[in-house]
Amino acid sequence: MAFQYQLMAQQLRQKIQAGEITAGQRLPSLRQFAEQQNISLNTAKSCYEMLEAQGLIYVKAKSGYFVQRPSAFSNCAIDAPKHPDFKSEMREVSTLALQIEIHEAAINSKLIHLGSIQLSSNLVPAKALSRSIQRALKYSKPEDFLYSDRQGHIRLREALSAHWAEDGFHISPELIYISNGCMPTLAVMIQSLTSEGDGVIVPTPNYNGQLQMLALLNRKIVEIPANTEGFDMVRLEHAMQESGAKVCLLTANFQNPLGFCLSNAEKEKIAQLAAKYQCYVIEDDIYAECSFSAQRPLPIQYWDQQGYVVYCGSVSKSLSPSYRVGWFCLPTRLKPMHAKIILRNVSVNTPLQLGLADFIFSREYRQHLTALRPKLQQQVQQYREFIAQAFQGVDFRLNHPQGNYALWLQFPDQINSLALYYFAAEQGINLVPGILFGEDSRYNNCIRLNAGHELSEEIQQAIQLLADWVRAELNNQAVA
């Protein structure tokens, strides 16, 4: 059953697409819209956020919401899987060998990297980071050069707690554990909360790195369908209740690869379902800081009242991919597992922790994010516009993220993304074929591209090569 804000968004979308509300027209303010429709302010906000995520409207600072020009939201929607026989049942990840092959190709520095989701070095505040590390070392104490607390240095835990509090998200430093990046964190929690052969509930399509990690840990998956508006909440509840899986691995804010951001109502619902069915949610919130708006969205953990949500994150997507520093927040309910988890969580380099703590406390991180967010938004829009131009005449769909910098392209069913991947590799181009993001070759007509680098002439030429291949493939099949 749809939420009220989804029904309101559908009605507004129909009016925009029918021309009843024209491009450039200003919409009622959130308060006015709530009063007109006799709905709560939160429902109105969720409605506008959904339309913004779909590229139908945009917000101007201190001016309000406006209808986007049509060219900006054409080809923006990705359908949910069109498989009537698609069942959310426990199964093994079948693409492990291919996952490993493509992962190794992604670190080849000689390739044009359109695949791996990472920031350009031009967006990394290298000088400011160096200053923070130098300050941290200058004012460090003798004990900072000994083995550190396995939970992580208290200075960094306090810095993260204070940083999140500014965004209305409060977690005690005592509940924060520092790790060597987000993926090791997820692996630690999967190993701690499940056993080999157990199932883990994941949306589909889902980040291929997570699927690879689950396969290597000999965990099965229970897939629930997702699209650019989020995932099927009814199927999620059914999976929690019936599948036998007692852990979900979810990203609520700017999911990779689709880029959706769940509404606050949906996040609260997930926290409630987790408690109702005693199904732990491991929340990967690695992209929250990459929001295109000034305010980062709240995580599912914000609504967790019973201790069934484990909050995880890292700075690798918002600061630097080389800073392999992550964290997880252990709810009080799981404190008895402290020793078991600490044993699996390898200690993190102490000077690096102190440097990052200085970077946060000095507000350099906040300033970096303030500059980064509009830059990412601009880059993503430039990529979308160039892709629309390059693939002109091709029946394709393209997501419209409001955070994150992953672009998900869906082509006609005749396109084999694995064949496109091998063609691109021969041309010195790296991309990620959609087949890696789910089972049953469900996304073999999709690819994921990275918009974290400036749209250079070299990248434009690479995208044009991909478009030419797709167009030629469709023409050849049409003739045949």
Regions found by a protein language model. Name each.
Residues 1-134, 314, 342-348, 382, ...:
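N-terminal basic, amphipathic alpha-helical segments
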Residues 60-62, 173, 400-404:
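Short Gly/Ser/Thr- and Asp/Glu-enriched loop/turn motifs at secondary-structure junctions
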Residues 88-180, 188, 361, 430, ...:
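N-terminal small-domain helix-loop-helix segment of the aminotransferase-like
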Residues 129, 305-374:
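Conserved core segment of the aminotransferase class I/II
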Residues 140-277, 282, 288-290, 295-303, ...:
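Conserved core of the PLP fold type I
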Residues 374-384, 396-410:
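Conserved glycine-rich beta-strand-loop-beta hairpin in the small C-terminal domain of fold type I
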